[in-house]
Regions:
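Immunoglobulin-like IPT/TIG beta-sandwich domains and homologous Ig-like subdomains
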Residues: 36-98
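Bacterial N-terminal signal peptides
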Residues: 7-16
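Substrate-binding/active-site clefts of carbohydrate-active enzymes
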Residues: 134-323, 342-352, 368-369, 382, ...
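Hydrophobic faces of well-ordered beta-strands that scaffold small-molecule active sites
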Residues: 125-127, 183-185, 233-235, 329, ...
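Beta-strand/beta-sandwich contexts
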Residues: 20-51, 103, 107-111, 117
C-alpha cells in the first residue's frame, strides 16, 4: 500500500513539474526605439506564466523587474531600453523549474521623431463619423465567426449595420471635396460584446482593430491615404473603462485592476455628476462614486491609480501614434478617470509629442467648469490637467437653446452666444477649445425638422468663431433625428454608403435640391476656411446684440472678417455706426456667401 502512495505522489509531482506554461499574448505586440521614456512594460498573458522567471539577451535591453499579479496567468515584465538601442528582434525566455518557453519580441524604428507629429488646431475642421454608420466597403467582414453573438440589421437602429474602414477609404474624395481637414472616428478597436457594440465604446482588445471594421494594417493604410489628401485622423480612445467581455474581467489580473470589482454582487454606478472635481465642499463619498463608479454594467471602470494599469494605457496611446501615425486623440469620458493619472498621461504625451493635440470629452455646460479642465488653467491651480483642448459643451448648450428663441431681450437667442464668449477670459487658450452644435451623443441640430436657414446661421458661427470646429457626419446633407427613441436615431446610415441604397447623397445627383444647397454651403465655407490665417490665428472682437443682430470680427495681420447674425424672424436694420471701429472707412467688403433673409448670417471680408 505504501508503494502505491509513493508512486501516486511521484506522479503528481511529475505532473506539477510539467504543467502548462503558455504565452498567448504580449502587449504591446512590439515597441519602438528612440522613445524618451526608457521603461517598457510588457503584459504577458498565458496559462501559468505568472510563476516564470524571465531573461533577455539583447544589446541595449535589460530586465528591470517582473511583477506577479493575483492571477497566475499574467506576468508584467519591465524592460529598460538604452537611448542608443538598435531596432531588431530578440528572445524573451521564460523559465520555471525545468520548463522553458521562448518568445520573440521586436523593437522597431520610429517613422519620425516625436516633435514631427503635428496635431489638429484651429486651422482644422473636424468631421466626426461613426464607422458602422457611414459606408460598407467590405460586406465580407460583416459577419465574423467566433465573436460574441450579434446581428447585422440595418432596420434595427441599435444593431450593427456593417459600415467599416474600407467604406471610409473608398469615399475619401468626398471629404476632400467637402473641405474638412480632419476625420474623427468613434472608436475602432475590438468590441467583442454581445449585441455587437457598434458604437465602439466597450473595448475588449486595446491593440486590435475590430475585425468587423477591418484590420490594423487596413486602418494604417486608410490613414496613409487620408494624409495623401491632407486629411488628418483623430483616434477616439477610452481610458476610463473597457468592455465587460475583456479578458481582464474574465480573468482579472488583480482586484485593484478595476474600481468596485465585485460588480456581480455589489454594482456601483457613477453618479454622472462631475461637480466633485471643483466643489470646495464635496464629500469623499460623492467624489468616490463619481470617479470610481461604473458607467453601465457592461463597462467596467478601470483603476488608473494602479501604476500598472496606468502604464499599460499610456503605452497603448503612444503605440497607436507610432504605429498608425494618427494626428490626434479624442479621450472619451475624460473627467471620470483618475485626475492625477490623466494629468500625468498628458504631461508624458506632451513631452514625447510637443506639437500634438488631445481633446478631452468634458461634458459640463458651465464655461468656468470647462475652463477648469484646460491646460494651465488658473481656476484649477495648483493642479494642472495638461489637457490642451477641451470640448465646449457650453457653446453647444447655448446654440441649441438660442435656435428656438427670438433675439429680442437680454439672455435670449443670440445674446446667449455673446455671453458665452464673454467667459473666454477664463480659458488659458480659447482658440484651443473644440466647439460643435451636435455630436453622436446628442439630438441632431435640426431635431426632426429641416430648417436650413437656422442650420446655416449656426454653422457660420461655428466655422468662423475663435474655436476648433467639429462637424457631425450628414449635417451637410441635413440629416436629422432625436434621441428620445434611442441613440440609433441620431446615428443613422449615410445614404449611399451601402450598395443598393435608394439614394446616394455622396454624389450631387443623389441629393435633393435642398440637400445640394446645404452641401454647397458647407463646401464653400469649409474650403474658404482652409489655410485662412484670419480664422486660424486671428483675434476676435464681438459686439453686444443690437436690434436682434449679433456681430463679431476676426482680425489678423491687417485682414478682417466681419460676421453679422440676425437672430430674429424678420428683416432688421442696424446702423453701421455700431461697428465703426471695424468697418472704419471701408466702402465695401467681399461677401463670400450672400444670404439676406431672417435668421441668417452675412460674412464680409474687409
Amino acid at each position: 500500500m505504501k508503494k502505491v502512495f509513493l508512486i501516486l505522489g511521484t506522479l503528481l509531482l511529475s505532473l506539477s513539474t510539467y504543467a502548462a506554461m503558455n504565452v498567448n499574448k504580449i502587449d504591446p505586440p512590439f515597441w519602438y526605439t528612440g522613445m524618451q521614456n526608457p521603461e517598457l512594460q510588457l503584459m504577458v498573458y498565458g496559462e501559468g506564466i505568472g510563476n516564470a522567471a524571465v531573461s533577455v539577451n539583447y544589446p541595449g535591453v535589460s530586465l528591470s523587474s517582473t511583477v506577479k499579479l493575483e492571477s497566475n496567468n499574467y506576468l508584467l515584465v519591465y524592460l529598460k531600453l538604452d537611448k542608443d538601442v538598435k531596432p531588431g528582434k530578440f528572445n524573451l525566455t521564460f523559465t520555471e523549474g525545468k520548463k522553458k518557453l521562448v518568445k520573440e519580441y521586436e523593437l522597431k524604428a520610429r517613422n519620425k521623431k516625436g516633435c514631427e507629429h503635428k496635431g489638429f488646431d484651429a486651422s482644422d475642421a473636424l468631421y466626426l463619423l461613426m464607422p458602422d454608420r457611414f459606408a460598407n466597403g467590405n460586406p465580407d467582414n460583416d459577419q465574423i465567426a467566433g465573436m460574441a453573438e450579434y446581428k447585422v440589421d440595418r432596420n434595427d437602429p441599435n444593431a450593427r449595420h456593417g459600415g467599416d474602414l474600407a467604406g471610409i477609404e473608398q469615399h475619401l474624395d468626398y471629404f476632400s471635396d467637402l473641405g474638412v481637414t480632419a476625420l474623427w472616428f468613434t472608436p475602432v478597436l475590438e468590441n467583442n460584446m454581445t449585441g455587437g457594440s457598434y458604437h465602439g465604446y466597450a473595448t475588449t482588445d486595446y491593440y486590435k482593430v475590430d475585425p468587423r471594421f477591418g484590420t490594423n494594417e487596413e486602418y494604417k493604410q486608410l490613414i496613409e491615404k487620408a494624409h495623401a489628401r491632407d486629411i488628418k485622423i483623430v483616434m477616439d480612445m477610452i481610458f476610463n473603462h473597457c468592455g465587460v467581455e475583456h479578458v481582464w474581467i474574465k480573468d482579472m489580473p488583480s482586484k485593484d485592476w478595476f474600481n468596485n470589482p465585485d460588480h456581480e454582487n455589489n454594482f456601483v454606478q457613477t453618479s454622472f455628476k462631475l461637480t466633485p472635481h471643483v466643489d470646495p465642499y464635496t464629500s469623499q463619498y460623492d467624489a468616490d462614486q463619481m470617479n470610481d463608479g461604473w458607467f453601465v454594467p457592461s463597462m467596467p471602470d478601470l483603476n488608473q491609480k494602479n501604476p500598472h494599469v496606468y502604464r499599460y494605457l499610456v503605452q497603448n496611446s503612444f503605440w497607436w501614434i507610432e504605429f498608425a501615425n494618427i494626428d490626434g486623440i479624442r479621450m472619451d469620458t475624460y473627467p471620470y478617470a483618475d485626475y492625477d493619472a490623466m494629468s500625468n498621461w498628458m504631461k508624458e504625451l506632451n513631452e514625447e509629442y510637443p506639437n500634438y493635440n488631445t481633446v478631452g470629452e468634458t461634458w459640463v455646460t458651465e464655461p468656468a467648469y470647462t475652463a477648469w479642465w484646460q491646460k494651465d488653467s488658473k481656476l484649477s491651480a495648483p493642479k494642472n490637467s495638461n489637457l490642451k483642448t477641451v470640448m465646449d459643451f457650453s457653446f453647444f448648450d447655448k446654440i441649441n437653446t438660442a435656435k428656438n428663441e427670438q433675439t429680442e431681450t437680454w439672455f435670449k437667442g443670440l445674446d446667449r452666444i455673446y455671453n458665452n464668449f464673454v467667459y473666454d477670459f477664463l480659458y488659458p487658450n480659447p482658440a484651443s477649445v473644440l466647439a460643435f452644435i451636435e455630436n453622436h451623443d446628442t439630438d441632431r441640430f435640426l431635431g426632426e425638422g429641416n430648417n436650413l436657414p437656422m442650420l446655416k446661421q449656426a454653422s457660420t458661427l461655428l466655422l468662423t468663431t475663435r474655436r476648433i470646429p467639429q462637424l457631425y457626419y450628414g449635417t451637410e446633407i441635413m440629416m436629422n433625428g432625436v434621441k428620445s427613441k434611442s441613440d440609433g436615431y441620431v446615428r443613422k446610415d449615410f445614404p449611399g454608403g451601402w450598395t443598393g441604397d435608394a439614394t446616394n447623397a455622396l454624389t450631387p445627383a443623389g441629393r435633393t435640391k435642398i440637400q445640394n444647397e446645404c452641401y454647397d454651403f458647407y463646401k464653400t465655407l469649409l474650403n474658404w476656411r482652409k489655410g485662412n490665417d484670419v480664422i486660424a490665428k486671428g483675434s476676435m472682437v464681438q459686439f453686444m446684440v443690437q436690434n436682434g443682430v449679433y456681430a463679431y470680427a476676426r482680425q489678423y495681420e491687417g485682414k478682417t472678417i466681419f460676421v453679422m447674425l440676425n437672430g430674429t424672424d424678420a428683416e432688421t436694420t442696424v446702423p453701421l455706426k455700431f461697428y465703426k471701429e471695424i468697418l472704419k472707412n471701408s466702402k465695401q467688403g467681399k461677401d463670400i456667401i450672400i444670404v439676406i433673409t431672417a435668421i441668417t448670417a452675412i460674412r464680409i471680408l474687409l
